[in-house]
Amino acid sequence: MLIVLTAVTVEVLGHGDLSDYGALQRDWFITINHALASAPGQIWSNLTLLGDGAVLLALLSPLILWRPQAWGAMLGAAPFAGALSATAKHWFAMPRPAAVLDPQQINVIGDALTAHNSLPSGHALTIFTGLIALLAVLLPRPAGWRQWSVVAGGLLLAGVLCLSRIAVGAHWPLDLVVGAALGWVAGLLGAALSRRYAGWPQVRRGITGRCLSVVILGLSIALLIRAADTPPGPPALWLAGITAAAVAFCLLVGWPRQPAQPSVISEPARPG
């Protein structure tokens, strides 16, 4: 992935014309965009929301109740992901597809994005940040077909979610590749950061749990307001907001009572 990023950068800067970045992958983009248009637009508009950092953290907030270090790894990775995304977008300033292609050539779902901040895809970066942070904590050394199936399934799901950015007409294919690569780095950094804190099993208790419940409740309220202000109210936003509200309530009342589970998921023992 890093080789692809380097090659694209050299090619574009060598020509001295930022529009060449889109020209290199115009046919790829149009082919994929048209192929994905066969699925209902509402599916893609909801799937693409899962690349929103607030939505992803809210939907996965139940991890706080059972595997808090995994959720903490995602939260810890967020600043790295944000910094990588903002820096790269400003540095490359690549035009989005709708900025250089004729409107009749592409299928756009939602608003047509025309800014010069296409590279990398922030959604792809967020998706892979979350996935890699989770896998690095829960399955740091996959063993056995079950665990490898989880890894493969996670990567497949992440790939589909990334493709939603092409489906809605927001990103070029290489935006997704670079975003995924940077997200991989951010996810590993978040997981490494989470390992430096030893108090995860008790993070739901006492003042820490109550403070965390306030944060999660605030996230829930923000998402529910956003859903109400976005007709017709994307189900992904409502689901994320309600999930976070339920987790905030659980934290407030101290449920579940038992301590959090160990972060690493072990392979079931084989019968002798």
Which sequence ranges carry the predicted segments?
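Membrane-helix interfacial "entry" motifs
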Residues: 34-45, 58, 62, 66-70, ...
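Membrane-embedded catalytic cores of phosphoryl/pyrophosphoryl-handling enzymes
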Residues: 107-257
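Alpha-helical transmembrane spans of integral membrane proteins, capturing the lipid-embedded, hydrophobic core
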Residues: 3-4, 54, 74, 78-86, ...
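Alpha-helical transmembrane segments
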Residues: 1-8, 77-81, 155-156, 214-219
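N-terminal transmembrane-helix/juxtamembrane module of multi-pass inner/ER membrane proteins
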Residues: 1-55, 87-114, 253-272
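Hydrophobic alpha-helical transmembrane segments of integral membrane proteins
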Residues: 72-101, 161-169
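Hydrophobic alpha-helical transmembrane segments
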Residues: 48-67, 123-138
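Interfacial segments of alpha-helical transmembrane regions
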Residues: 60-84, 150-151
